[in-house]
Amino acid sequence: MICLVLTIFANLFPSAYSGVNERTFLAVKPDGVQRRLVGEIVRRFERKGFKLVALKLVQASEELLREHYVELREKPFYSRLVKYMSSGPVVAMVWQGLDVVHASRALIGATDPGDAMPGTIRGDFCMEVGKNVIHGSDSVESAHREIALWFREAELLCWEDSAGHWLYE
């Protein structure tokens, strides 16, 4: 029940729903799944201290992907992106924690792996922009939209993280 109230509040007042309760959407793309990188990616987010709220392995439909990447529809690579993302399974996840949207972008690294720093996911595991292993929400607003697109409300687990008091003051 408390999760439902928090989610409704977050959707009505996204700028107020931040801090340790901020959520982001991540998706390990088909190349990351095929290369068996899911565990390593989850490990990095857990070690950072973020809380996993939802995770599922899905074969994303082109319809879902067109909606997900709607802001890129005018780009020349849009059709290739949708085809690539629907070419195999995707691991969709929701993570929660302090400034998780911004921090997850730093963990992921630059979109173009050539610009990604060593130590980031893309810096360590990617060679080219067309196969860059992972998607991460670029803003709190995008995270709300993407989470609602990929997950039903009942799939978002609200649980008490016993390590929280070791992470936050």
Curated annotation (Swiss-Prot):
Membrane topology of the entry: Peripheral membrane protein
Catalytic activity line of the entry: a 2'-deoxyribonucleoside 5'-diphosphate + ATP = a 2'-deoxyribonucleoside 5'-triphosphate + ADP; a ribonucleoside 5'-diphosphate + ATP = a ribonucleoside 5'-triphosphate + ADP
InterPro entries from the UniProt entry: NDK-like_dom (IPR034907), NDK-like_dom_sf (IPR036850), Nucleoside_diP_kinase (IPR001564), Nucleoside_diP_kinase_AS (IPR023005)
Metal-binding found in the keyword field: yes
Cofactor: Mg(2+)
Its EC number(s): 2.7.4.6
UniProt note: domains: The N-terminal hydrophobic region (1-17) is critical for mitochondrial outer membrane targeting and phosphatidic acid binding.
HAMAP family, per database record: NDP_kinase (MF_00451)
Quaternary context: Homohexamer. Interacts (via its N-terminal region) with KAT5; this interaction enables recruitment of NME3 at DNA damage sites where it plays a role in the repair of DNA. Found in association with several ciliary nephronophthisis proteins, including NEK8, CEP164, ANKS6.
Family indicated by similarity: Belongs to the NDK family.
Its job: Catalyzes the phosphorylation of ribonucleosides and deoxyribonucleoside diphosphates, other than ATP, into the corresponding triphosphates with ATP as the major phosphate donor. The ATP gamma phosphate is transferred to the nucleoside diphosphate beta phosphate via a ping-pong mechanism, using a phosphorylated active-site intermediate. Through the catalyzed exchange of gamma-phosphate between di- and triphosphonucleosides participates in regulation of intracellular nucleotide homeostasis. Inhibits granulocyte differentiation. May be required for ciliary function during renal development. Independently of its kinase activity, facilitates mitochondrial tethering prior to membrane fusion through its direct membrane-binding and hexamerization. Implicated in repair of both single- and double-stranded breaks in DNA through its association with the ribonucleotide reductase complex (RNR complex) via its interaction with the histone acetyltransferase KAT5, this interaction enables recruitment of NME3 at DNA damage sites where it plays a role in the repair of DNA, independently of its kinase activity.
PANTHER family: NUCLEOSIDE DIPHOSPHATE KINASE (PTHR11349)
Protein name: Nucleoside diphosphate kinase 3
